[in-house]
Amino acid sequence: VIGGAEENINEHRSL
């Protein structure tokens, strides 16, 4: 699952 984890981190960083 490459990209999914990165997307999750991006969402948390935006918060």
Swiss-Prot record:
GO molecular function terms listed in the Swiss-Prot or TrEMBL record: serine-type peptidase activity; toxin activity
Q: What is its EC number?
A: 3.4.21.-
Domain Peptidase S1, which positions?
Answer: 1-15
Q: Where in the cell is it found?
A: Secreted
* Tissue distribution of the protein: Expressed by the venom gland.
Regarding activators and inhibitors, the annotation says:
Inactivated by p-APMSF, leupeptin, iodoacetamide, protein kinase C inhibitor, phosphatase inhibitor, ATP and PGE1. Is insensitive to acetylsalicylic acid, ADP scavenger system, protein kinase A inhibitor and hirudin.
Q: Which domain of life is it from?
A: Eukaryota
Q: What keywords are assigned to this protein?
A: Hemostasis impairing toxin, Hydrolase, Platelet aggregation activating toxin, Protease, Secreted, Serine protease, Toxin
Q: Does the keyword Protease apply?
A: yes
Top-tier EC class: hydrolase
Looking at the keywords, is S-adenosyl-L-methionine present?
no
The record's GO CC annotations read: extracellular region
The record lists its disulfide bonds as: none
GO process annotations (BP): proteolysis
Give the function comment from the record: Snake venom serine protease that potently induces platelet aggregation. Its aggregatory activity is partially inhibited by monoclonal antibodies against GPIb and the thrombin receptor. Its ability to induce intracellular Ca(2+) release is blocked by pretreating platelets with thrombin. Hydrolyzes thrombin chromogenic substrate CBS 34.47, but shows very weak coagulant activity. Can hydrolyze fibrinogen alpha-chains.
Q: Which family does it belong to?
A: Belongs to the peptidase S1 family. Snake venom subfamily.
Q: How does it assemble?
A: Dimer (it is unsure whether homo- or heterodimer).
Identify this protein by name.
Snake venom serine protease IVa
Q: Which organism is it from?
A: Cerastes cerastes (Horned desert viper)
